UniProtKB/Swiss-Prot annotation:
Residue intervals annotated with topology Cytoplasmic: 1-2
Gene Ontology MF: a single term: catechol O-methyltransferase activity
GO BP, sorted A to Z: artery development; behavioral fear response; catechol-containing compound metabolic process; catecholamine metabolic process; cellular response to cocaine; cellular response to phosphate starvation; cerebellar cortex morphogenesis; cholesterol efflux
Protein name: Catechol O-methyltransferase
Cofactor note: Binds 1 Mg(2+) ion per subunit.
Organism: Mus musculus
Transmembrane segments: 3-19
Family per record: Belongs to the class I-like SAM-binding methyltransferase superfamily. Cation-dependent O-methyltransferase family.
Superkingdom of source: Eukaryota
Binding site for Mg(2+): 184, 212-213
Leader peptide range in chain numbering: none
Protein purpose: Catalyzes the O-methylation, and thereby the inactivation, of catecholamine neurotransmitters and catechol hormones. Also shortens the biological half-lives of certain neuroactive drugs, like L-DOPA, alpha-methyl DOPA and isoproterenol.
Length: 265
């Protein structure tokens, strides 16, 4: 009995120390991704992403992007958490799309296609969205999600690592410069890929970078770079982590042209 009590106490202490170090947001993400999801996979079969797609196919209306978004939001808020941009931050994204009306958008990180559907439904006629996804299983689900929403003609999925695909955009994908970039992939790639976009001449004066999850999990090096560089004019939009009451935010960084930067690598 004493040993059990001591063990429980040590586990509680370890949890509290982890919570203090990481914060509620990262601990919650870890719980959902590494504890809850494997259990659900075992009990329900398939993957979480496949279950999200199946829910959309069963509950959304084909050819209706808004109903697709609502079905994903309902599933992820009531059944299984997933790292989509979500409706709270999604409304901020909508406002940015409506303000700038981009004709060519690059998305880094497609996941299940939520943000691709969200952006593509608001793009003006003739506009296109290129979305990069390193995981071929996620890319396949994104394609099915776009097909179901009726947006397949507006979006092209590029499968591979962003650092490999970005240098190919001009020659292989007929890109001159980008009007908007949505960053929502690996957080440690935000800064390197921003630098790569600059180096490849893919940004023009007025190109909008919109970065998700800059607070949780967090992108401190990216924020330090864009906020400290005269090449960018930044605006922070405080919001909540998708499907949680945990503070997160989006960072908008509008490219002003080459300037002084605190980071050179």
């Amino acid at each position: 009995m004493l040993l059990a009590a001591v063990s429980l106490g040590l586990l509680l202490l370890a949890f509290l120390l982890l919570l203090r170090h990481l914060g509620w947001g990262l601990v919650a993400i870890g719980w959902f991704e590494f504890v809850q999801q494997p259990v659900h996979n075992l009990l329900m079969g398939g993957t979480k992403e496949q279950r999200i797609l199946r829910h959309v196919q069963q509950h959304a209306k084909p050819g209706d992007p808004q109903s697709v978004l609502e079905a994903i939001d309902t599933y992820c808020s009531e059944k299984e958490w997933a790292m989509n941009v979500g409706d709270a931050k999604g409304q901020i994204m909508d406002a940015v799309i409506r303000e700038y009306r981009p004709s060519l958008v690059l998305e880094l990180g497609a996941y299940c296609g939520y943000s691709a559907v969200r952006m593509a439904r608001l793009l003006p006629p003739g506009a296109r969205l290129l979305t990069m996804e390193i995981n071929p299983d996620y890319a396949a689900i994104t394609q099915q999600m776009l097909d179901f929403a009726g947006l397949q003609d507006k979006v092209s999925i590029l499968i591979g690592a962003s650092q490999d695909l970005i240098p190919q955009l001009k020659k292989k994908y007929d890109v001159d410069t980008l009007d908007m970039v949505f960053l929502d992939h690996w957080k440690d790639r935000y800064l390197p890929d921003t630098l790569l976009l600059e180096e490849c001449g893919l940004l023009r004066k007025g190109t909008v970078l919109l970065a998700d999850n800059v607070i949780v999990p967090g992108t401190p090096d990216f924020l330090a770079y864009v906020r400290g560089s005269s090449s960018f004019e930044c605006t922070h939009y405080s919001s909540y982590l998708e499907y949680m009451k945990v503070v997160d935010g989006l960072e908008k960084a509008v490219y002003q042209g080459p300037g002084s930067s605190p980071v050179k690598s």
